């Protein structure tokens, strides 16, 4: 990238587009959030290992170090959840996370993902890191977010990542993606979930499960998963299907 990525720019309520207006599609949008506009349905790619059909390269710096720190805390919290399931002493935040997981326990596939996405979105009040922590950027592990019931976009994504793992989804099918919105010019974190060969994007500003190929108004920059932090780069397939997206990726 030619510009330094600034984590402090992550927006806690950024809006990304859908292939139809929320109201027309019968989608329930969380009260107080901006409505969603129409977008093109141009597909960027065929199903792939990475969201948006893009290639990746290892990322270093602040993004990588913050993700590794959160991963270490997630590992500790997963051990606590194991104890909770064996009826040992369980902190309130862990019980709340298990309650979120239970929202989708009796369902499968898209229904399970949607119910857990809804439960997380309704459990957390969108709050900037400046307002909550007095710093430009702070990434919280799930228990910390659920203790305060406040967080910004990456905090929602991290809770969803762990909740869906606990619900039985594979780590291979879960990736946190950092996007750069075109308007406003802000960075925004979402969770990408692979289902039946397609990637669904779960944001904190809507209850809709949006296919990656139905999104416009933002470009993907980083992907965070079990393999660490990686920067997304435009592939030849993306360049052929969407020259504008390819050009904007190369410019940043």
Per-range role (PLM):
Residues 9-17:
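Bacterial N-terminal signal peptides
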